[in-house]
């Protein structure tokens, strides 16, 4: 795992097309903004896991959360 330190307003790049920007820090919560092409799905981990579980049950999940 790569560990990076960023301050509010700073950005990191993932590949050539995905950016992650630290928008704010309040206590133990960090607000981030993700800018990615439409074909790249971006989900919180718990939502991603639910989508994967639904796929395993034959259900179709759509949309970003």
UniProtKB/Swiss-Prot annotation:
GO molecular function: mRNA 5'-UTR binding
Domain of life: Bacteria
SUPFAM superfamilies per UniProt: CsrA-like (SSF117130)
The entry's keywords: Activator, Cytoplasm, Repressor, RNA-binding, Translation regulation
GO cellular component, one term: cytosol
Main location: cytoplasm
Gene3D superfamilies in UniProt: Translational regulator CsrA (2.60.40.4380)
Pfam families, per database record: CsrA
Gene Ontology BP term (one): positive regulation of translational initiation
Disulphide connectivity of cysteines: none
Location of the protein in the cell: Cytoplasm
Annotated coiled-coil segments of the chain: none
Keyword NADP: no
UniProt entry tagged with the keyword Zinc-finger: no
Cross-referenced PANTHER family: CARBON STORAGE REGULATOR
Known function: A key translational regulator that binds mRNA to regulate translation initiation and/or mRNA stability. Mediates global changes in gene expression, shifting from rapid growth to stress survival by linking envelope stress, the stringent response and the catabolite repression systems. Usually binds in the 5'-UTR; binding at or near the Shine-Dalgarno sequence prevents ribosome-binding, repressing translation, binding elsewhere in the 5'-UTR can activate translation and/or stabilize the mRNA. Its function is antagonized by small RNA(s).
Subunit structure: Homodimer; the beta-strands of each monomer intercalate to form a hydrophobic core, while the alpha-helices form wings that extend away from the core.
Family: Belongs to the CsrA/RsmA family.
HAMAP family to which the protein is assigned, alphabetical: CsrA (MF_00167)
Name listed for the protein in its UniProt record: Translational regulator CsrA
Organism field: Vibrio campbellii (strain ATCC BAA-1116)
């Amino acid at each position: 795992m790569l560990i990076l330190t960023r301050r509010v307003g700073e950005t990191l790049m993932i590949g050539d097309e995905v950016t992650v920007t630290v928008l704010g820090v309040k206590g133990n919560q960090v607000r981030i903004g993700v800018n990615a092409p439409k074909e790249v799905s971006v989900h919180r981990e718990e939502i991603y896991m639910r989508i994967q579980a639904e796929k395993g049950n034959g259900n179709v999940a759509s949309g970003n959360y």
